[in-house]
């Protein structure tokens, strides 16, 4: 019986696919056919590519027989992506310690339910004592979340909350109402912490519509209570609806259940809002790829890009919610993995990357629990549009609003501290053109996974 099998080999090393058919001995290791491929495709270095079958990288020491190839098999050859540059930035990863933060800024922490409840009870008891001893001056002292109390710190490279306070006291009818609302909220939060149950912000509002009057009021009170207690909002067991998803080479426990993110299909695994329920993270990935849009995420998931280049892929489907940001930070802290960002080449894509990187003003008191200050901007860079020959019909003229946002962004301290960001934004403004990630699919829907990302990562072409 013949040991020969027929291999249809697709060359994905270039932007244009080429194919060839080879007859090989099923008992010969794959490495033995590299010389033939070298001759067929004129590949200069035989160690410059890898074999893939069913989207997974193959061990070249094994034979087709060991790999259970059919008599007629289709395999791909792709660039062997060097992770040398990724390894280099991994050595340079930095997480600020307590001593790195400026004196007086508000830094909150994730705390378990019992410790958060203890702080809440102590704060409530202190307020009761105040009302008994000096009722006219009894007040809740809450760190102010006003814009003038928020600033960018160049040392930690984060947006932080200062130590200015606002006073909620029995001094007018309006302040009496706000104190009553805070007291009611504290009672509701105490009940759920005691049972270690989670609720949404909307649930909290509907627990007492008459006193809160509007959900925006209860939402703000929740943030005020968290910062007053020195804990994250998640520590109050109050969560918001989430939209983030993850796929790739990571598994973890969620409420005790084992989650394997390589088996989540194209749709990925929804990121739970209950980040405190995620434990025992394990991964053989080399980096995290944060993607702006779900469409790009689905392309990466369907092509199983993480099997080709070992990574974890996450999207917040646009502007990320708290849970997505906290999940990215959790991976960064627990697994010590570099994070690369893939966004649209426009001011709003950069604004999303900025939120992942330095935090947002609205949640400045939680920046340390959500921001990853050393994220690298992998793409889509404005300079990539010419470098990767994105045609003019796939580029979009910037609107006056786009230009104004870009001009404002270039003046920000965060951007000024990153010269390459300045260069890329200036290039965008000078050409007056922007582009979406989907522009990479102008000729081939797999161009991003087969060519663009492998070459960007291989060469370390990030900002």
Residue spans of the language-model regions?
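Nucleic-acid enzyme cleavage-core boundary/entry regions
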Residues: 87-340, 347-463
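Broad hydrophobic/π-residue packing in well-ordered secondary structure
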Residues: 53, 67, 205-206, 341-343
């Amino acid at each position: 019986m013949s040991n020969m099998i027929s291999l249809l080999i697709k060359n994905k090393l270039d932007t244009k696919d080429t194919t060839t058919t080879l007859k090989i001995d099923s008992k010969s290791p794959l490495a033995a056919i590299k010389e033939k491929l070298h001759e067929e495709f004129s590949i200069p270095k035989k160690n410059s590519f890898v074999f893939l079958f069913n989207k997974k990288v193959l061990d070249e020491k094994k034979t087709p027989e060991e790999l259970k190839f059919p008599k007629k098999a289709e395999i791909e050859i792709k660039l062997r992506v060097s992770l040398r540059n990724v390894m280099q930035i991994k050595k340079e990863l930095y997480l600020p310690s307590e001593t790195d933060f400026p004196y007086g800024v508000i830094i909150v922490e994730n705390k378990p339910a019992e410790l958060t409840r203890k702080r809440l009870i102590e704060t409530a008891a202190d307020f009761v004592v105040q009302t008994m001893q000096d009722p006219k001056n009894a007040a809740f002292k809450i760190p102010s979340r006003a814009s003038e109390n928020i600033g960018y710190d160049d040392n930690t490279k984060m947006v932080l909350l200062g130590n200015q306070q606002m006073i909620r006291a029995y001094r007018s009818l309006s302040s009496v109402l706000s104190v009553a609302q805070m007291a009611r909220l504290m009672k509701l939060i105490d009940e759920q912490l005691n049972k270690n149950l989670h609720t949404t912000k909307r649930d909290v509002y509907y627990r007492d519509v008459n006193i809160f009057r509007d959900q925006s009021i209860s939402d703000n009170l929740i943030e005020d209570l968290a910062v007053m207690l020195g804990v994250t909002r998640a520590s109050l067991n109050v969560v918001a609806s989430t939209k983030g998803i993850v796929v790739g080479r990571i598994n973890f426990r969620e409420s005790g259940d084992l989650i394997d993110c390589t088996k989540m299909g194209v749709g990925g695994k929804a990121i739970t809002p209950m980040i405190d329920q995620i434990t025992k993270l394990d991964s053989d990935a080399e980096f995290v790829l944060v993607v702006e849009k779900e469409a790009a995420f689905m392309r990466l998931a369907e092509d199983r890009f993480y099997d080709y280049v070992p990574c974890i892929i996450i999207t917040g489907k646009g502007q990320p919610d708290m849970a997505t940001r906290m999940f990215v930070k959790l991976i960064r802290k627990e697994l010590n993995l570099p994070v690369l960002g893939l966004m649209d080449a426009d001011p709003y894509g950069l604004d999303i990357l900025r939120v992942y990187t330095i935090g947002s003003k609205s949640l400045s008191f939680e920046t340390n629990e959500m921001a990853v200050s050393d994220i690298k901007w992998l793409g889509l860079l404005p300079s990539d549009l010419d470098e990767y020959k994105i045609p003019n019909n796939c580029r979009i003229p910037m609107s006056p609003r786009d230009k104004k946002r870009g001009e404002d962004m270039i003046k920000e301290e965060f951007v000024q501290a990153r010269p390459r960001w300045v260069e890329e934004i200036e290039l965008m403004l000078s050409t007056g053109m922007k582009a979406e990630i989907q522009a990479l699919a102008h000729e081939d829907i797999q161009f991003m996974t087969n060519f663009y990302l492998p070459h960007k990562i291989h060469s370390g072409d990030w900002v």
